[in-house]
Amino acid sequence: GSGSAATDKFKAERATADTSPERLAAIAKDALGALNDVILKHGVTYPEYRVFKQWLIDVGEGGEWPLFLDVFIEHSVEEVLARSRKGTMGSIEGPYYIENSPELPSKCTLPMREEDEKITPLVFSGQVTDLDGNGLAGAKVELWHADNDGYYSQFAPHLPEWNLRGTIIADEEGRYEITTIQPAPYQIPTDGPTGQFIEAQNGHPWRPAHLHLIVSAPGKESVTTQLYFKGGEWIDSDVASATKPELILDPKTGDDGKNYVTYNFVLDPA
């Protein structure tokens, strides 16, 4: 299914973690204990157990573990990271980040197709500062988001490379002004076992419209986050459980028909 699109990228990254055997044993014990407690609490039957085993096999064979984990688990890992931060709230990265997107000046327009240009423009501006409010010269704002049909470049063959992606270099005061388009809500892929998982519970596969960002500066802790839109559909029932009140934008429409919004990022020291 289409949910496997992020798997090759994840394999290429070869994730590592400096985790001691003792810590791993403690986590594994608690995780398996919690799962066994659920089985006992709900009286899971052998037919249900066999269906679960087959579903686990299907997720692996379908290449959907990155999709499933990023949608249903990553928000808790991000919540652990957030405990140590004083600056801008983070959110999940999701499966569609591509590093080394083209560098763009502090005032710029994201790469887009002619059909993208017909969508309502969004002018997104702000400043990157430290905890004391000092602008961070040359800070990087990596921005990516789906098109109006819910597709991400590099994960949809019909889109040109780097469509609606860029690494914006802030000016000497840490300021930026980026013109892009107003994104739309979209469904996560539903044609594989992740979709079956959602459908079996009468759930929905929708994510509210959002921007993805990674903001960084020398000597500072980078922040990975998402920004949402006030009043947006699905904002109160995000399938990925990733929305936060502090990350909701409220754009205003200008006389020129464009939507304008400002959001400032505050970075913790590294």
Swiss-Prot record:
Pfam family, one: Dioxygenase_N
Cofactor binding, note field: Binds 1 Fe(3+) ion per subunit.
Transferase among keywords: no
Catalyzed reactions per annotation: catechol + O2 = cis,cis-muconate + 2 H(+)
GO BP annotations listed: catabolic process; catechol-containing compound metabolic process
Entry GO MF terms: catechol 1,2-dioxygenase activity; ferric iron binding
Protein name: Catechol 1,2-dioxygenase
Binding residues for Fe cation: Y152, Y186, H210, H212
